[in-house]
Amino acid sequence: DLVRSRGLGDVYKRQVCMVLSALLLMKNSGEEIIYVVNTGYQSMDSVRLADGTKVMLNAGSRLTYPKEFSGEKREVQLSGQAFFEVTPDKTHPFVVKTQKMDVTVLGTSFEVFSYDGDEEGETVLLTGKVKVEVLESNQQKGGSYVLKPNEKLTYSKTDGISLTTIDADAYSSWRQGKRMSFKNETLEMILERLEKWYGQKIECAPHIARHYRFTFTMHSESLLSLIHISEPTRPY
């Protein structure tokens, strides 16, 4: 049966909606089995790849990966948000390919946020070193960037590419369970994350969304309750 559900434990069993499908792709050397994992709204899932790499997928994400890695690189494709703990292998770099950027590592832990169709994407590094290749488009020039721990690269169709220093562990705390932590983040960025988690469109005037910043941590609150969670830290 190619369609089934699984969870991360009893806490998630009722809310995790995951579809696992196997696609057979014919190649000259024979058949290669490709797996596609999709997570539903308000759900997460974990995947262990053939090389031992651990991947945690957040809500509304899709990961495509081979049953076995072959060739010079270990390549996977991502649309969404995922945290990677990559098994070191200097002779076979690990590459996460997205619609906006390619992230190459040898062995490290990092997060990629890049949904197909969105105008923004991020890479956050916790440990080790990664090289981010931002893909060139009609609206944005590409480029190559090497990140150090606690650095975040942000790609924006309107604002270009930026590098900032953050607390990467806190920023990626969603992987520890149904929890998201925001520290002095713009309302615009927060609403984007909440839309992905709850699967609902949240409308807010652009001049307000970009004007205020919030600091708070959410666990498994309803979307309605989050409306009253915090006062803005200050406009900038």
Region locations from a protein language model:
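Short, well-ordered junction/capping motifs at the entry into regular secondary structure
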Residues: 1-2
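A residue-level detector for the "anchor" residue at the start of short, highly conserved motifs
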Residues: 6, 10-230, 234
